[in-house]
Amino acid sequence: MVKAGELVEQQKAAMEEEANAEAAEDQEEPEDTACSSSSKKKKKVVPGIVYLGHVPPRFRPLHVRNLLSAYGEVGRVFFQAEDHFVKRKKKAAAAAGGKKGAKYSKDYTEGWVEFRDKRVAKRVAASLHNTPMGARKRSPFRYDLWNLKYLHRFTWSHLSEHLAFERQVRRQRLRAEVAQAKRETDFYLRNVEQGQHFLAADGDATRPNSSWTFTQRPTEQEFRARKAARPGGRERARLANVEDQARSNRGLLAKIFGAPLPAESKEKP
């Protein structure tokens, strides 16, 4: 009986120990889940973008990736190429100066660098701004300074939209220029055709027997002839001639006899 009682007590003790162990595991599980959730929150990283305002000649995305990778993980890099007009102008200036073409014919004006962590991007932009690009003495970018700016709340999708908008504006400007050039060409061709028809109708001015015809304003004699040709115009013309002769005779008599003209005598008191 004693042995049976001891066995029962041992079984009860074992069952109590198992229950305590399960309760302890149940208490540890929410703590583990809380730790895992906090670790996930800590591991959530937001990327940041740094704007590169100055890109020296022969500076490529590979160079900026190699230089900035020492401070943090670098993601995507994009450089904006210079305009084709500027590129052609540089080539023309180099050809006029007798210089050989550069090995790297393509240069860039600005760039964007994406860091995996925005905190690293802020730190890099704050620490490297206005500092030399190249640390070595033989570096070709030693005398160029970093021009960095952290873009707050700026994502890569914003950059893609901005570049797409610029491309659309460039296409619209190109279409407008092409339309303007077409209008000017059509206007020139129309003028050429009109000139050819004009020369064919009136003759070529370069030939000695040809002549140009132009409509001019009629003279005073032509005006009088037209008025006289109208009904009653001859009588009016005769009366006008008589009045002119009388006016001239009156002035001649006044000069001979020294008498004032009738109009002058009326005006004087």
From Swiss-Prot:
<comment type="subunit">
    <text>Interacts with ESF1/ABTAP. Interacts with IGHMBP2.</text>
</comment>
<dbReference type="GO" id="GO:0006357">
    <property type="term" value="P:regulation of transcription by RNA polymerase II"/>
</dbReference>
<dbReference type="InterPro" id="IPR039119">
    <property type="entry name" value="ABT1/Esf2"/>
</dbReference>
<dbReference type="GO" id="GO:0003723">
    <property type="term" value="F:RNA binding"/>
</dbReference>
<keyword id="KW-0694">RNA-binding</keyword>
<dbReference type="GO" id="GO:0005730">
    <property type="term" value="C:nucleolus"/>
</dbReference>
<keyword id="KW-0804">Transcription</keyword>
<comment type="function">
    <text>Could be a novel TATA-binding protein (TBP) which can function as a basal transcription activator. Can act as a regulator of basal transcription for class II genes.</text>
</comment>
<dbReference type="InterPro" id="IPR035979">
    <property type="entry name" value="RBD_domain_sf"/>
</dbReference>
<feature type="domain" description="RRM">
    <location>
        <begin position="48"/>
        <end position="145"/>
    </location>
</feature>
<dbReference type="InterPro" id="IPR034353">
    <property type="entry name" value="ABT1/ESF2_RRM"/>
</dbReference>
<feature type="compositionally biased region" description="Acidic residues">
    <location>
        <begin position="16"/>
        <end position="32"/>
    </location>
</feature>
<feature type="region of interest" description="Disordered">
    <location>
        <begin position="220"/>
        <end position="244"/>
    </location>
</feature>
<keyword id="KW-0805">Transcription regulation</keyword>
<feature type="coiled-coil region">
    <location>
        <begin position="164"/>
        <end position="194"/>
    </location>
</feature>
<keyword id="KW-0238">DNA-binding</keyword>
<comment type="similarity">
    <text>Belongs to the ESF2/ABP1 family.</text>
</comment>
<dbReference type="InterPro" id="IPR012677">
    <property type="entry name" value="Nucleotide-bd_a/b_plait_sf"/>
</dbReference>
<keyword id="KW-0539">Nucleus</keyword>
<feature type="coiled-coil region">
    <location>
        <begin position="5"/>
        <end position="29"/>
    </location>
</feature>
<dbReference type="GO" id="GO:0005667">
    <property type="term" value="C:transcription regulator complex"/>
</dbReference>
<dbReference type="GO" id="GO:0003677">
    <property type="term" value="F:DNA binding"/>
</dbReference>
<protein>
    <recommendedName>
        <fullName>Activator of basal transcription 1</fullName>
    </recommendedName>
</protein>
<feature type="region of interest" description="Disordered">
    <location>
        <begin position="1"/>
        <end position="40"/>
    </location>
</feature>
<dbReference type="GO" id="GO:0021522">
    <property type="term" value="P:spinal cord motor neuron differentiation"/>
</dbReference>
<keyword id="KW-0175">Coiled coil</keyword>
